C-alpha cells in the first residue's frame, strides 16, 4: 500500500483528553501513516502543547504547521494540504474515534483510482456509548453527485483525498461550516471521482452546544450565501437553490428540540437504537 499523510487541524478550545484518544486511534491502525500533518490553528493551551510534545517525541512522523493566529478550519486545512508530503491524505478530527481497520479499508479503495473515499459515520454525544445515530451515504459516484445537489455527500472528517485533485479544484477555502461541502462541489465540477465505503468507519463526537450552534439568523445568513454561490458556480439549478434554501430556513429558525428531530430526517440519519 502507498504512503499517505494524516491531516489534522487543532485550535485552543479542543479537549486534550479527547485529542489524546483520537491520536491513540491513529497509532492503533492496522496500516500506519507515513506522516501526520498537524496544523496548529493559532496559539494553543499548555495542555494541548503537552499532548503534542509527548506524541511527537514518541512518534517522529509529525509535521507541525503553525498558524500565528486562528484562521478557521478551511484555511488551516489549506495550509496543511500544501505542507503534506504525500498525495493521499487522510482527514481526522481531534475529538473523534475510529476502528482499527479504517485506514486499511479506505486506502485500498482510493488506490483503485478514486479521488475521494469516505464512509458511513456514527454520531455520539460526548462519550462513545451514547450513540445518537448512524449516518449512511450512497456508495457510488453518480449517486454521491445527486446527493451533493441537496447537501454534503461525504463525511469530511472521515475522508481520504488525493492532494493533486484537491489542489486542482482550488484547495480548501474559508467557508465557515461549509469548507467541506464547498470543496466537494468544486472537485465534482473538476471531474473528481467519489466513493463511500458502506460501513461506519468513523465515530463523530458531538456535544449539545455543537448541535445547537448550527442555528439562528447569523448561521442561516452565511449558509444561504454559500448555497447561492453553488448556484452562481453552475452546480445548483434554480430548483436546487429554492428547495435547499427553504429547508434550511425552516430548520435553522425552529426551536432546538424540534431541530434535532428534523436534523435526523434532513441529514439522512438512521436511529442507532
Task: Spell out what each predicted region is.
Residues 13-28:
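Short, well-formed alpha-helical segments that are part of the catalytic scaffolds
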Residues 40-49, 69, 93:
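A conserved acidic beta->alpha catalytic loop
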Residues 67-84, 105:
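Glycine-rich, basic loop-to-helix element that forms the pyrophosphate-binding segment
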Residues 89:
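Short aromatic/hydrophobic "clamp" motif used to bind/position activated sugar donors
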Residues 101-132:
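Conserved donor NDP-sugar-binding/catalytic core segment of glycosyltransferases
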Residues 120, 134-152:
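Short, flexible, basic/aromatic active-site loop/helix in glycosyltransferases
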Residues 176-183:
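Acidic donor-binding loop at a coil-to-helix junction in glycosyltransferase catalytic cores
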Residues 192, 204, 212-237:
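Catalytic core of nucleotide-sugar-dependent glycosyltransferases
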